[in-house]
Amino acid sequence: MHCGPPDMVCETKIVAAEDHEALPGAKKDALLAAAGAMWPPLPAAPGPAAAPPAPPPAPVAQPHGGAGGAGPPGGRGVCIREFRAAEQEAARRIFYDGIMERIPNTAFRGLRQHPRAQLLYALLAALCFAVSRSLLLTCLVPAALLGLRYYYSRKVIRAYLECALHTDMADIEQYYMKPPGSCFWVAVLDGNVVGIVAARAHEEDNTVELLRMSVDSRFRGKGIAKALGRKVLEFAVVHNYSAVVLGTTAVKVAAHKLYESLGFRHMGASDHYVLPGMTLSLAERLFFQVRYHRYRLQLREE
């Protein structure tokens, strides 16, 4: 089985925090205090009582993270930084779990995206009734078809995972951190990796591809995926690429809304996409279908 680096992207949200400069008033107060310490205090002149000194200003809260980090509201302590070799297994686990979640979505919810498959299944149920004249047997046909969809979705997606885990995800540092134009980032919370994303350059058209975005299911809804996506956009801008592209077979609407919120435009979809690891057997064609969506964010015109 030939396994090329796959293009499926995992879905799921934080805004990149920026370091705050020190308040200029603080420096001024420090200079005044130093000057006052050089001279002895003068005796108080007679007159009305002086007003009590103003209370010191409250300390300014500093954002979490730092250079390369992110700490928005709802994502306390989360930082986005480059991948380290010791985090290989944690990154692979998050990627694996995120892809395995696709199985029921592809088998059941994804059926709504394929009217031809729906029509075929309806014809099979009608044929069963015409042959058997059994209403009970006919009612079992949809359940059997959905069971077959789940079986083949699991089979194909697991084969896809095997390809991915033995290609780019087998050695993240070698595949993403060493080649120019590529990088891999992790989202870290309390010392634990909770999200991943990768970028890979295509020099022929001066674009960067967003890949492997996934967030641990226990930490979703905190803006981590959006922060990871923005890190890829920042990488593309810094390295002077003209656009960022991505492809996804995600079924959930939330994933597509995330890409649009980052500024991506939907460029089209294909119903005949072949995942790495597929055998293209007749059974797979009948019971496994995915729609591949293409997105693009233009950063500058060539």
Curated annotation (Swiss-Prot):
Induction: By methamphetamine in brain, via dopamine receptor activation (at protein level). It is linked to N-acetylaspartate deficiency: A metabolic disorder resulting in truncal ataxia, marked developmental delay, seizures, and secondary microcephaly. Catalyzes the synthesis of N-acetylaspartate acid (NAA) from L-aspartate and acetyl-CoA. Promotes dopamine uptake by regulating TNF-alpha expression. Attenuates methamphetamine-induced inhibition of dopamine uptake. It is a single-pass membrane protein. The gene is NAT8L. Keywords: Acyltransferase, Cytoplasm, Endoplasmic reticulum, Membrane, Microsome, Mitochondrion, Transferase, Transmembrane, Transmembrane helix. It comes from the Eukaryota. GO terms for molecular function: L-aspartate N-acetyltransferase activity. Residues 46-60 have a biased composition (Pro residues). It is an enzyme of class 2 (transferase). Residues 143-283 form the N-acetyltransferase domain. It catalyses: L-aspartate + acetyl-CoA = N-acetyl-L-aspartate + CoA + H(+). Belongs to the NAT8 family. The chain crosses the membrane at residues 121-141. Its EC number is 2.3.1.17. It comes from Homo sapiens (Human). InterPro entries: Acyl_CoA_acyltransferase (IPR016181), GNAT_dom (IPR000182), NAT_camello-type (IPR050769). The keyword Membrane applies. It is found in: Cytoplasm; Microsome membrane; Mitochondrion membrane; Endoplasmic reticulum membrane. Residues 46-72 are annotated as: Disordered. GO terms for biological process: aspartate family amino acid metabolic process. One of its GO terms (cellular component) is mitochondrion. This is N-acetylaspartate synthetase. Aminooxyacetic acid (AOAA) blocks its activity in both cytoplasm and mitochondria. Expressed in brain.
